[in-house]
Amino acid sequence: DSEFAELKIRGKIFKLPILKASIGEDVIDISRVSAEADCFTYDPGFMSTASCQSTVTYIDGDKGILRHRGYDIKDLAEKSDFLEVAYLLIYGELPSGEQYNNFTKQVAHHSLVNDRLHYLFQTFCSSSHPMAIMLAAVGSLSAFYPDLLNFKEADYELTAIRMIAKIPTIAAMSYKYSIGQPFIYPDNSLDFTENFLHMMFATPYTKYTVNPIIKNALNKIFILHADHEQNASTSTVRIAGSSGANPFACISTGIASLWGPAHGGANEAVINMLKEIGSSEYIPKYIAKAKDKNDPFRLMGFGHRVYKNYDPRAAVLKETCKEVLKELGQLDNNPLLQIAIELEAIALKDEYFIERKLYPNVDFYSGIIYKAMGIPSQMFTVLFAIARTVGWMAQWKEMHEDPEQKISRPR
């Protein structure tokens, strides 16, 4: 039987359908309120508003649960690889062995970008931020695929594959250009993560051998960042896509949103904060500063808009961080890790943070891992974009397949 919520406005009662979720909270359908009640709902930041129905990702922030297509994020991070998770998000189920092989071959086949794109890179000054270069390059792909300016349903899957394949190449090119080194072409004999590391760190005169511990760590990072419900950048991609904009333009809007320090740039802010603290002996001082409303200092890497429990991604990354630093001989002498571990221990016992449910989030340890890998801080958000492209494309595809979706137009 259908359930309804009652909304009383100026003495008149309106019955609003309650939509049953397959998992998680039920939802009150307010889509007819403006037409029937002659008023709108007001929800700054969409704190209590669902903009779509989605089966891609589920989060229970109170319990610290994150699932992709029903699979727990910890299981995926430990037992899967990034392209298998990409297939899961795009198609809705894990691939068979044959499907996985075909998918990885297609991604490898489309990893090259048009050579004319090199001219675009040359228009940027050498000090340009890699995110600025990447943003322009991804948007410019529209010029190389004019047939997708008027895309069809038959184009969805190939478009997703092209995007997943080309973003790492563009990301590595952005980095190489920013440091004045020649571009390195993709090597299709390598898997997805190895290939990206190869394009980042190889040079024409030296071969780069990928450390398997580093590769596995980056694979986990990519999986952990692949999708996260209707966050700012994903919502931006959906809003752009709702107008019928071509997929390259949509993904470039997601990159722009991700670039914001409150979204994709948070792990770089964590590194800067740990450097500012400087030593474990100063942690109590900075804890006090974080509690002081009049002090501009903020404890970065703690708290999350959705999670009111320990971010499950942070738990995986904490152990991954230790594995990487142990492999590199830095486990016992990395000052940033020591400060981070002690800061977390102190904060989790402090009533101020406990009452406010401020737990470490995904950004708290990822920057330390990147830094240990030799990835500079200006590339942190670029790597986030590589991973999140999978989620953006899954959500973009789902949006276009949803008959209820309309052009987004907030009031």
UniProtKB/Swiss-Prot annotation:
Q: Which reaction does it catalyse?
A: oxaloacetate + acetyl-CoA + H2O = citrate + CoA + H(+)
Taken from the UniProt entry, a GO cellular component term is: cytoplasm
**InterPro entries assigned:** Citrate_synth-like_lrg_a-sub, Citrate_synth-like_sm_a-sub, Citrate_synthase, Citrate_synthase_AS, Citrate_synthase_bac-typ, Citrate_synthase_sf, Citrate_synthase_typ-I
Pathway listed for it is: Carbohydrate metabolism; tricarboxylic acid cycle; isocitrate from oxaloacetate: step 1/2
Q: SUPFAM superfamilies attached here?
A: Citrate synthase
What molecular function does GO assign, one term?
citrate (Si)-synthase activity
The main enzyme category here is transferase
What EC number(s) does its UniProt record assign? Answer: 2.3.3.16
* Any one biological process term the GO annotation gives: tricarboxylic acid cycle
Q: One matching Pfam family, short form?
A: Citrate_synt
Sorted keywords for this record are: Transferase, Tricarboxylic acid cycle
The active site annotation covers 304, 363
Q: Does the keyword Transferase apply?
A: yes
* Signal sequence range: none
UniProt xrefs under PANTHER family: CITRATE SYNTHASE
Share any extra remarks. Citrate synthase is found in nearly all cells capable of oxidative metabolism.
Family assignment? Belongs to the citrate synthase family.
Could you identify this protein by its name? Answer: Citrate synthase
Organism of this sequence: Rickettsia japonica
Per UniProt, what is the name of the gene that codes for the protein in this document? gltA
